[in-house]
Amino acid sequence: MNAIGPALSLFDPTPAVAARSPDPLRDLPETDNSPGAPERLLRINAEMRARPWPAPYDATRHVIRFGDARDLSWIPSESVHLVVTSPPYFNLKPYESEASGRQLGRIGDYEAFLGELDKAWSECARVLVPGGRICCVIGDVLVPRRAGGRHWVLPLPADIQVRSRRVGLDNLTPILWFKIANRTNEAGGGSAGFYGKPYQPGAVIKNDHEHILMLRKPGGYRQTSMVQKALSMMQRDEMDAWMRPVWSDIRGASLRQGHPAPYPVELAERLIRMFSFAGDLVLDPFAGSGSTAVAAVRTGRNSISVEIENSYIGMARGRVLKEIANVARCGVQAATAHLTVER
């Protein structure tokens, strides 16, 4: 496997000093407490969404690496600002077989599966900067009646929340993402009949939601430049809609992408914009088809994607390159992006 090499520059969590600011950044307030600072920052943010960003925020770097989420030793400690990921489902999704010996989603024992996930969360906690967080998109595991003689649910999100405390992470209020479920896979190949008979005693509540867990590494708030704040702010309508515990305006991703458990780029994009700044480094240790990396390109963040299935690396590469070309054509925000693939 190649060393991380030139991509090592991604891992400096200290914001670079921006070049001389073009309009409209000339009107930046000196501090958050300057007269009219919030209004000025919001106005600048709205204008900069349609303009090229200043250096160094005008260029991003993205690394897709063949590797295991349980071993991120090649990433320096406290170098990642945000983790956005969706770990494999326990023993239900049809993941590829080439990495079956290491693929978490193919572990047959639930407690052993949780133990292996703990190793990944421990590595994420190590590489996160103090105060950084993990946004984990995960759903309950539905076990169909024909698989075990009875219908039951493994509360995977709740188990992750409880066990994350063992690796030093704090739980924050999660988001309930209401979506249209991909029933065939999530129910182990089921159909509408999986949900039970139409009369009440045999009914089963439809599973059309996932949890977005918020796991935070203890630490204070980061000091960032006023330029970063201006480029990264949410507008008031976005804040009103996004900072709620239930989301219902983003649909689940199509399985036609070629991955058994994709999640939409719009979901990753929103989480990145909510919990990171322009120029930050975002990690996805379970990269899959590359939705987090695509969202990072789109939002002017750097990214590292780690994936254990070779076939998904090619898929992620194609999607990221397509997004890089699209962003370059638009000529706004971080219009220059570079991709490195390491196997």
Q: Language-model segments: what does each one mean?
A:
Residues M1-M315, R343:
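Core catalytic lobe of class I
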Residues G314-R343:
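PRPP-dependent phosphoribosyltransferase catalytic core
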